[in-house]
Amino acid sequence: MSTLGNQYDNSLVSNAFGFLRLPMNFQPYDSDADWVITGVPFDMATSGRAGGRHGPAAIRQVSTNLAWEHNRFPWNFDMRERLNVVDCGDLVYAFGDAREMSEKLQAHAEKLLAAGKRMLSFGGDHFVTLPLLRAHAKHFGKMALVHFDAHTDTYANGCEFDHGTMFYTAPKEGLIDPNHSVQIGIRTEFDKDNGFTVLDACQVNDRSVDDVIAQVKQIVGDMPVYLTFDIDCLDPAFAPGTGTPVIGGLTSDRAIKLVRGLKDLNIVGMDVVEVAPAYDQSEITALAAATLALEMLYIQAAKKGE
């Protein structure tokens, strides 16, 4: 049995090649990979425009434009020479069965983490982060969350599968510690009593990158960190292809600098979510997501090279 069931089951939304043209490996548990990329083509929990199930394919497709650069600016080294990264394709589940997706994703993540691998996941809508957090918390214990988004996703509407409730549920399950967690780029209403430090888009756009990063490091401390990036954190001028766009967001330049600034954190898991290519223009949203994902891998490679 392969990693994800049958690698052809999701062929309507899957790719023939891996992210950045990295090797495809449908048996990553026994591989010597440091990081494993998993696509999660799921959008049943969205409250806005659907289409996030096509996000992983769009990110991989456009990533070929990034594969040529070896001594990537401004890092001046090739991530692939420091990290062993493989792409295991997309999670296979019965489309239409949100619970099965959640259970299979958590089981897949638990097996990878138990084998000593780290995960970079592509959504899919943001709900996919919750089963990933459950798996990571089993392995690493309670974590800090560094969360880029236009929305806090801390809404308590009682729905089991909703991409706006994960970070209300996760603290209650003991997966993350809100007092050591930061939400960056927020520009919609939220409950100020949830314990998270919220750095709204207005202040993040006005403050220096170094100042924001210093505050993030102070809040997170030395806890294990899960990094999640909802692409709607970016302004729709830079990322129109998403389900719930909100104007007044971060530029792609500011976002990439902030991600680079997280290099010294103890990041144990990462994801990029909410790319919906049906609403994209010239693949700029997918390109932003692919570039941010690549930068996430570079901050890991930079630490390994020290």
UniProtKB/Swiss-Prot annotation:
Cofactor(s) this protein cannot do without: Mn(2+)
Enzyme Commission number(s) of this protein: 3.5.3.11
Keyword Metal-binding listed: yes
GO biological process: putrescine biosynthetic process from arginine, via agmatine; spermidine biosynthetic process
Pathway entry: Amine and polyamine biosynthesis; putrescine biosynthesis via agmatine pathway; putrescine from agmatine: step 1/1
GO molecular function terms listed in the Swiss-Prot or TrEMBL record: agmatinase activity; manganese ion binding
Keywords: Hydrolase, Manganese, Metal-binding, Polyamine biosynthesis, Putrescine biosynthesis, Spermidine biosynthesis
Family membership: Belongs to the arginase family. Agmatinase subfamily.
UniProt-listed PANTHER family: ARGINASE/AGMATINASE (PTHR11358), GUANIDINO ACID HYDROLASE, MITOCHONDRIAL (PTHR11358:SF26)
Entry protein name: Agmatinase
Organism of this sequence: Shigella boydii serotype 18 (strain CDC 3083-94 / BS512)
